[in-house]
């Protein structure tokens, strides 16, 4: 079984590309059913956020990568975007190292941001719910979560965390002098939407309107605030008219706010959705300011220097954690092989022993039977090693011969 991952992220792909290849907003159960239906795909975990879409897989044949790319390409709306031009393939320990760094926030656009760990955990939970995760992949994710917890407790990588949501609010503040007199509309009440809401409330705007598909979730977030209200997405036309700042963090398949939905009133639009929820053409209107996820980079750069030292400490913890994981996996593999070896030996011995005992009970010469039993066991036990040594010799694999000699305590110098 091999461990691989296929990824499209912000480092190689701009927002319009990431939007095309995003798997968020699709039926999760359908995604898992379809990917597990591919021959040689054994287990899978699908992660899709605003900055990346990654698929972690246990496979039985590396040639299946082409089939997985075809599967992924099938969800792309614009055929001009070819996944082979953008994806990154990782294998083996590289997958585990990347996932550890990702969960610790070291691969994020905002170095050290904590939200990604929750997103990785959510993806893991959905995979389990859809019976898509196996023992090996489960052990990988459990070690990843333990590593992230240790990094958070032993470093200050998350100290005064600066998230994409926080950076978005920073951009809004730069564009509006007196935010206390402004009305803010947040579209989406998911994890990022809730984080946006918290940051916005700290700025004490005149009014915060939170719109979501299910109003109960929005009501739960806004209920403790006098200047906040919860709304259905269907109320967007009325809410847009009131809003000075519109921030979107929602999973949609098409734009939910376009130029025809807004008038001449100056507004700040910030879209951190993938795929994009606010039409980028809104920024072409003279009175508007428009930001997408990629525009947040400049704000994030200001924060990176502060976290580089803590990042190096986190890297050391991750390397140590990976070493621990690999050692444990070696033990699991060897213990499994040893158990299988003993079971094989038991099977060989039990059958011959029963036959020999039956002959002795029938009055046959016990000494002769025991000698014959020992000879048969010797032949059976050594059969596969002898075949293996002959095959290794034919192929010129002296390394295999040396290894097998060591296994049986033979002289490796001869």
Swiss-Prot record:
Supply the CDD domains for this chain: NAD_bind_Glutamyl_tRNA_reduct
Site for Important for activity, residues: 98
Enzyme class of the recorded protein, top EC level:
oxidoreductase
- InterPro entries, from UniProt? 4pyrrol_synth_GluRdtase, 4pyrrol_synth_GluRdtase_dimer, 4pyrrol_synth_GluRdtase_N, GluRdtase_CS, GluRdtase_dimer_dom_sf, GluRdtase_N_sf, NAD(P)-bd_dom_sf, Shikm_DH/Glu-tRNA_Rdtase
Residues the entry annotates as binding substrate: 49-52, 108, 113-115, 119
Molecular function terms in GO for this entry?
glutamyl-tRNA reductase activity; NADP binding
Instruction: Note the HAMAP family from the entry.
Output: Glu_tRNA_reductase (MF_00087)
What is known about what this protein does? Answer: Catalyzes the NADPH-dependent reduction of glutamyl-tRNA(Glu) to glutamate 1-semialdehyde (GSA).
Q: Which PANTHER family match?
A: GLUTAMYL-TRNA REDUCTASE
Comment field on protein domains: Possesses an unusual extended V-shaped dimeric structure with each monomer consisting of three distinct domains arranged along a curved 'spinal' alpha-helix. The N-terminal catalytic domain specifically recognizes the glutamate moiety of the substrate. The second domain is the NADPH-binding domain, and the third C-terminal domain is responsible for dimerization.
**What name does the UniProt record give this protein?**
Glutamyl-tRNA reductase
Q: From which source organism is this entry?
A: Francisella tularensis subsp. novicida (strain U112)
